[in-house]
Amino acid sequence: EQGEMTNRDLLELAAKAIGMDVDFFGDENGFDCVTDEQQYWNPLTDDGDALRLSVQLHIDILHRFCGGARVEALAPGGRVIAEYCHVDTRGDATRTAIVRAAAEIGKAVK
């Protein structure tokens, strides 16, 4: 079984899910990605990029507080395809859940 995906892996698959090519640059401490239209894109850190990604892929977001706070990302039809627990970083958790869900969708893209 494969280990945890890196942020770069998640972003590559999320971009694939929406048919976008991205290039990465930076170092081990951080990186940026640029779309084929030369625009910065990182839905893990940018609320607008994350919202556009969820809209394009019809991902619904639920905030739950059962046994701890968590964010769930749902595919069309209501199936949970990603969830991310958080303490007090709801924005980060929401963006991460969206990107994880998009990455799951991207895995199915040929």
Segments the model singles out, each with a brief description of its role:
Residues E1-K110:
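Glycine-rich anion-binding surface patch
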